[in-house]
Amino acid sequence: MIYLHKILPALASPLGLCLLLVLLGLLLNARRWVARGILILTVCALPATSNVLWRQLERGHALQDPSDAPTAEAIVVLSGMLRAVPSGDGFAYEWSEAADRYFAGVDLALAMKAPKLIFTRGAQPWSAGAPEGEVLFERARRDLVPEGMLALTPPVENTAQEAQAVAEMLSPKAKVLLVTSAFHMPRAEDLFREAGLEVTPWPVDFRASANKTTMMDFIPSAGGLSGTSTALREFLGRAYYTYLK
């Protein structure tokens, strides 16, 4: 099932749609389908397009100071901020764009906003090395978070499983500070509430740019395409859990 959840969004991504339309155009000898595919890819590769989508996804959220956070039973940091890279005879871990999730969780823990800091053992079948939460657990110890505060979920593959795993670790209707990327927060918040938890969202890792729009935002780029693809995948995820789940 996890493979299906990854493959279907890829087919519906800008690049996937472009390739399908170009292939259809070549098979039918219809240039208009090729042109449509190229047009979709071009528009989606504009930084301006990705920024509009990010703003929509992150609407209603803002960065907050840890001192302003309410107290809770647990701080929950969702996986999705590490990547394994080759290193010598094995591999090592590096931060991805979502690294703010970890640092925000640690800041809340050190501010004593909850007695427990939970990392999720997020991993995919193809992931190298230990589940992400185990790596973050050890890093938090080095960052002086008391070991007695730290906890790990069982292995999980997606946000729905993370929510269920955390709910099983806490008391019914427990209050949690939920830390994840701003664009991912609405879907995560809904899933954690469905699992029976009282959620205070703590969004980080904002992707929308506050810079003024310039002509550079209307020049297609790999970064623009990547941003648009990620944003559209999140829209698809929200639609799936809203209408199909």
Describe these PLM feature segments.
Residues 1-27:
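Membrane-embedded alpha-helical segments of integral membrane proteins
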Residues 3-8, 49, 53-57, 232-239:
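Hydrophobic alpha-helical segments of integral membrane proteins
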Residues 15-17, 47, 245:
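Extended, histidine- and acidic-residue-enriched regions that form the cofactor-binding/catalytic faces
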Residues 23-24, 42, 239:
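Hydrophobic residues within the alpha-helical transmembrane core of Major Facilitator Superfamily
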Residues 27-34:
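Membrane-interface helix-boundary motifs at transmembrane edges
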Residues 35-47:
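Hydrophobic membrane-insertion alpha-helices, especially the h-region
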Residues 47-222, 228:
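A structural signal for short, hydrophobic/glycine-enriched beta-strand patches
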Residues 220-245:
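Structured C-terminal subdomain patch of bacterial secreted/periplasmic proteins
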